[in-house]
Amino acid sequence: MADITINGLTFEPYIEREKIAEQIQRVATEISRDCKTSNPLFLCVLNGAFMFAADLIRHVNLPMAEITFIRFKSYEGTTSTGVVKEIMGLNEDISGREIIIIEDIVDTGTTAVQLRALLEEHNPASVKMATLLFKPESLKQGTAPEYVGFNIPSRFILGYGLDLDGAARNLPDIYVLKENA
């Protein structure tokens, strides 16, 4: 893997696709074990989590599992705005359902807290979160997700669903913004 330049910023390789696949399998196994007696509804947060959600749901060993999608936005460029905008809301009845939110990354926790609060208004049986990436040093509110692929430092990353102003979501590996770039 070589460095790449997106919108004038240089990114270096960070997590290769093989390691991503290994962690997704581990997370799917944990979810399958924890939810073996239930019929969870997976809630994919678009746009960033679409690749993680697709790969995760294929490895979850729960034949009755369902998936749906919502969309929130909290980033402009490389920075979290601190304001979460709901772009596409929830359309399913989740009352009494076990919900597993699928996120690409949990950074400050702002989106996660607002999303959990929104879901709790609909009386689900439980709400858990699975994220591919978690920045524990950046967490300002809420709690750590129940299922985490990788704990990472507080640096800007892209690839494998994560973007910079819409670009680079399609990359199969994850890249980190080069320091002093």
Model-derived features: where do they sit?
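PRPP-associated nucleotide enzymes
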Residues: 1-181
